Amino acid sequence: MRAWEDFLLLQEKEIGTSTVDKWLRSLKVLCFDACNLYLEAKDSFQVTWFEEHIRHKVKTSLVNNNGKLIRVHITSLDKTAPFYKEKQIQQEKTAYFTMQYGNVNPEMTFGNFLVTPENDLPFRILQEFTKPAEDTAGFPFNPIYLFGPEGSGKTHLMQAAVNALREFGGKILYVASDLFTEHLVSAIRSGEMQRFRSFYRNVDALFIEDIEVFSGKGATQEEFFHTFNSLQTEGKLIVISSAYAPADLKAMEERLISRFEWGVAVPIHPLTKEGLRSFLMHQAEQLSVRIEDTALDFLIHALSSNVKTLIDALKLLSKRVAYKKLAQQLLYEDDIQTLLHDVLEVAESVRLTPSGIVRAVAKYYGVSPESILGRSQSREYVLPRQVSMYLCRQKLSLSYVRIGDVFSRDHSTVISSIRAISQKVEEGGDDISIATQELMKSLTSAYKSLEFFPEEEISC
């Protein structure tokens, strides 16, 4: 249809041909009448991108020959079947979407949270303010905003607070930020915004993780702003987590940042290496396992310093030591490799490495790992190469020199490449920023898959 093609040409001038080709021209036109255009996306992520970046534009720029605005209806292949009849399209327009709570692990409690000098303050704050209120004055610090790097214990503390509050009844909503966005997009598509707002605002407390996911997402930020105001006005508890302090959030509306700072913003830091070793040595003693210092260091490294995984490994080690009648024997690195060989093999298979990052980026962009590591200066390969370097820096904390060794580049090239991607990520909103965010999420999911122990073996 001519109106849609004219709109795409206009967008090429505004956001670039490559972005239009990837996100808009790949949309399939299912049906068109004088005032309605029905599109099909390849997946829900493409729908989300459309809602965040294009929806507001079609509302003002997509018109028919009579100058009337054309309404765009978009569905995705991974959630709906193809539509060939107008009746089926109408059914999709009015479909009732699913709202669900985020998953909360009942084993994550305040009682089994490892309290250290690095996390004592956020622990005490959340524990105090998740007790049942004795009056109706609400919470003296609202919202509670936790920020710190991956592995610092934010998720455990958040879920411990949710579990504590649910013991006293009430409606406690816990969601990740990407689930909030997914719910919003579904509500917009199906015309169920009133239901969406009721779901998020008729609660006694809202816990939302990884708020930085909202960066660059105007529609999501707008809706969360009103959700926040509604809950705040009614004195409902709001707890937010992020990798960044409020002032360090990029592509986030100032009015939201201001509200995040209304209550208390508390940093939370991961365990120091010495603190982790001391804690694990104490755990081993409690389990009647004697482990030599360098053997413990080996285990910490092998299991990527994941506290929960390390505790489970010690429990499993205790059972196997007892079974083999090795109690009170000092265990060395060779003993650990023998007794936990199956665990270590799985851990190695999911360990995040530079080559693993390159493979993930290659798969995302549809190129080969060899082309990313090669010498070609074609943009088709340069961009994935730069993203790979950026992720190696962010996820593995590799030095510029080490990254240069991996990609056979000098460190100045590495620095400029990483800076280029960092700038795009900070600005937010474009396809490079979105791709990097998706890759970070998928790599984090793979890392978290270290939790692989059979429950019947480690329960004590």
Curated annotation (Swiss-Prot):
Segments for region (Domain I, interacts with DnaA modulators): 1-68
GO annotation (BP), single: DNA replication initiation
Domain of life, per lineage: Bacteria
Span list, region Domain IV, binds dsDNA: 322-460
Region (Domain II) residue spans: 68-102
Region (Domain III, AAA+ region), start-end ranges: 103-321
GO function terms (MF aspect): ATP binding; ATP hydrolysis activity; DNA replication origin binding; lipid binding
Record's keyword terms, sorted: ATP-binding, Cytoplasm, DNA replication, DNA-binding, Lipid-binding, Nucleotide-binding
Disulfide bonds: none
SUPFAM superfamilies: P-loop containing nucleoside triphosphate hydrolases, TrpR-like
Protein residues bound to ATP: 151, 153-155
CC per GO annotation: cytoplasm; plasma membrane
Broad class of the protein's primary localization: cytoplasm
Localisation: Cytoplasm
Family statement: Belongs to the DnaA family.
Domain description: Domain I is involved in oligomerization and binding regulators, domain II is flexibile and of varying length in different bacteria, domain III forms the AAA+ region, while domain IV binds dsDNA.
HAMAP family: DnaA_bact
Function: Plays an essential role in the initiation and regulation of chromosomal replication. ATP-DnaA binds to the origin of replication (oriC) to initiate formation of the DNA replication initiation complex once per cell cycle. Binds the DnaA box (a 9 base pair repeat at the origin) and separates the double-stranded (ds)DNA. Forms a right-handed helical filament on oriC DNA; dsDNA binds to the exterior of the filament while single-stranded (ss)DNA is stabiized in the filament's interior.
PANTHER family reported in the protein's UniProt record: CHROMOSOMAL REPLICATION INITIATOR PROTEIN DNAA (PTHR30050:SF2)
Subunit structure: Oligomerizes as a right-handed, spiral filament on DNA at oriC.
Protein name in the entry: Chromosomal replication initiator protein DnaA 2
Organism field: Chlamydia caviae (strain ATCC VR-813 / DSM 19441 / 03DC25 / GPIC) (Chlamydophila caviae)
